[in-house]
Every structure is written in structure tokens, then in C-alpha cells.
């Protein structure tokens, strides 16, 4: 099969590509689902850098709550690529997240990290450079987008795509924004069967996301309750990242 585009260029074709072009997602729920396509994506990213850093050390951040087979797939991806890696290490994504935002994971007695991704949300409690508790929820941006699509269809009799739903989520779904606003989007009028436009309110978008976000909040509360008391006291001081 020929590959025409990767990354954002490929995503822009999602739901718009002709029948002879298939848009696929190499990752599914935080792990590699299509190894061949993931190899091509890695190769494209390395080419974008203009060189293959031969002999480099690679560190891959993988979800904590996945199987050893799924973790090995990440290792094999780099080890058998053109990167010619000197070493390949798999680390807990929560540790990498904390280091990435400048936290001292080794001296901290209690850190709570929430990684909200495309298809999953990972909750992790860290202490002394180790993962104390971790949970991978099958809820992410994609679930919110699908909920928005369904809500617009039900309430407006109007069909929008996931990319449009994602734009609504970013522009109207900010929970701290108290200003009421509406956004005009393109789609298909289901009653007439023709293309059209509709104004979608931020209230409709937020209501669509409520169930999924509530699930994440409940999971956070449950994990805090299961956290050892000394670690929990530190988290209550520092907050959630």
C-alpha cells in the first residue's frame, strides 16, 4: 500500500478522503495497534529531523497499566527501525510526564499526574521516583468528540464530523470560561439531507462532555482515597498536575 500523508496532514483528510484512500490511526488506547503504519510514521518523523541519529539512546514513555507484550511492541518499533539505536528503554509515561513539566520525581513524596490523551486518560500517583498507583481509563478526547457529535445530531438534527467536534471542544468546551458563546459550524442538515451551517452553543458542548468528564473526576477521587496517607498528604499540598 502507498502512504500519502502522515501526522496532521493525514488527520486533515479524516472523514474527507475519497474511497481509495483510507485514514488509519496506528495507536489505539495508548498502545500500538498497527505496527507497519507505526513504523512508517516513525520513519517519517526521523526524516523530518533531516538525519537518523545513529547510536543514540532512545527512551520511550509507555502507559504503566499495559501488558509486557504491548510494552515490547514499543521496544521493537525503535529497535528494528532505521534509527540504529544504541539502547532502547521503556519508562512509565507518568514518570516522563512529571519530568517533562519540571518536577523532581525522585525527591517528591507525593505527585498526582493526570494525562488526558486522545483515547485514554492515565491517572498516576508517584512517590520517590516510582509509580505507587496507576489507572488507564478508556476516556479521552475522541470520546468527548463522539459525545459532541451525538449531542449535535440529537438536539439540532445536524451531522458534524469528529474534526468539527474537536474544534467545538477546544473553542466552546473550556470549563473555566464563564462567557456564553456560540460557534457556527458546517455540516449536513439531516431533515433536508443537504449541506448547511448551524450555531452551536457552549452549553450544548459542555453538556455533551459532562458524563465523560464526571467519570474521570470519580476515578481521581477513588485513586486519592486508595493512596497511602503520607503520600496523600503531600498531594493535598501540591495539587494535581
Predicted regions and their residues:
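Short acidic, Gly/Ser-rich segments with clustered Asp/Glu that frequently serve as metal-coordination loops
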Residues: 118-120
Amino acid at each position: 500500500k502507498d502512504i500519502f500523508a502522515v501526522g496532521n496532514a493525514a488527520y486533515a483528510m479524516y472523514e474527507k478522503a475519497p474511497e481509495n484512500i483510507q485514514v488509519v490511526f496506528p495507536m489505539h488506547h495508548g498502545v500500538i495497534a498497527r505496527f507497519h503504519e507505526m513504523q512508517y510514521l516513525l520513519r517519517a518523523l526521523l526524516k523530518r529531523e533531516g538525519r537518523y541519529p545513529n547510536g543514540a539512546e532512545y527512551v520511550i514513555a509507555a502507559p504503566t497499566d499495559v501488558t509486557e507484550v504491548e510494552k515490547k511492541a514499543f521496544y521493537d518499533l525503535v529497535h528494528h527501525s532505521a534509527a540504529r539505536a544504541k539502547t532502547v528503554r521503556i519508562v512509565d509515561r507518568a514518570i516522563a510526564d512529571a519530568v517533562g513539566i519540571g518536577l523532581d520525581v525522585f525527591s517528591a513524596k507525593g505527585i498526582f499526574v493526570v494525562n488526558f490523551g486522545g483515547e485514554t486518560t492515565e491517572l498516576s500517583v508517584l512517590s520517590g521516583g516510582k509509580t505507587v498507583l496507576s489507572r488507564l481509563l478508556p476516556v479521552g478526547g475522541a470520546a468527548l468528540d463522539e459525545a459532541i457529535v451525538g449531542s449535535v445530531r440529537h438536539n439540532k438534527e445536524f451531522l458534524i464530523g469528529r474534526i468539527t467536534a474537536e474544534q467545538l471542544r477546544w473553542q466552546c468546551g473550556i470549563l473555566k470560561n464563564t462567557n456564553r458563546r456560540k460557534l457556527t459550524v458546517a455540516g449536513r442538515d439531516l431533515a433536508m439531507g443537504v449541506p448547511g451551517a448551524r450555531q452551536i452553543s457552549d452549553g450544548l458542548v459542555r453538556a455533551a462532555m459532562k458524563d465523560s468528564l464526571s467519570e474521570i473526576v470519580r476515578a481521581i477521587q477513588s485513586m486519592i482515597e486508595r493512596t497511602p496517607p503520607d503520600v496523600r498528604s503531600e498531594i493535598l499540598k501540591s495539587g494535581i498536575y
